[in-house]
């Protein structure tokens, strides 16, 4: 969103846009959210407090996108508390990469120590 420097600020702008849309449209039966990083999750997941905490720990892996997505999910949860919300992860598209494609060419010791893998986006 133009003029927004911080993901949280973008979330506030998008919340205003959402409020305006909800004032003119029927409430949805459910809401889907695109979230960049789902960690090891390979399938969509219902959004709740535990999932939000888990996804927040991954913010360093997608600092421009993850906090904004979580802020929007929070706003939607407040504006549409009865609508089920589901997170769909970019990482899920590549969760089943074969080991040869998912593994970086790094020393085995590093790979054993840190859970590094390719997720299929941004290199």
Where are these regions (language model features)?
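A gly/proline- and charged-residue-enriched helix-loop-helix capping module
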Residues: 54-72, 79, 113-123
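Generic structural signal for well-ordered secondary structure
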Residues: 11-14, 45, 69
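Short amphipathic alpha-helices and their capping/turn segments at secondary-structure boundaries
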Residues: 18-28, 73-79
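Short N-terminal secondary-structure initiator segments
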Residues: 3, 38-50, 110-123
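Short glycine-rich, Thr/Ser-proximal phosphate-binding strand/loop in the N-terminal lobe
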Residues: 1-16
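Short, contiguous clusters of charged residues that form electrostatic/catalytic patches at enzyme active sites
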Residues: 16-19, 70-74, 87, 123
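Short beta-strand-loop/turn "lid" adjacent to the catalytic site in phosphate-handling enzymes
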Residues: 25-66, 84-86, 92-104
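ATP-dependent carbohydrate kinase catalytic cores
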Residues: 78-123
């Amino acid at each position: 969103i133009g003029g927004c420097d911080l993901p949280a600020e973008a979330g506030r702008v998008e919340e205003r846009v959402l409020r305006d849309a909800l004032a003119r449209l029927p409430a949805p039966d459910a809401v889907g959210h695109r979230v960049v990083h789902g960690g090891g999750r390979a399938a969509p997941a219902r959004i709740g407090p535990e999932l939000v905490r888990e996804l927040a720990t991954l913010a360093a892996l997608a600092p421009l996108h993850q906090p904004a997505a979580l802020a929007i999910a929070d706003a939607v949860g407040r504006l549409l508390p009865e609508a089920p919300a589901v997170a769909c992860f970019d990482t899920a598209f590549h969760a089943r990469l074969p080991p040869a494609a998912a593994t970086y060419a790094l020393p085995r010791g590093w790979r054993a120590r840190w859970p590094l893998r390719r997720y299929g986006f941004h290199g």
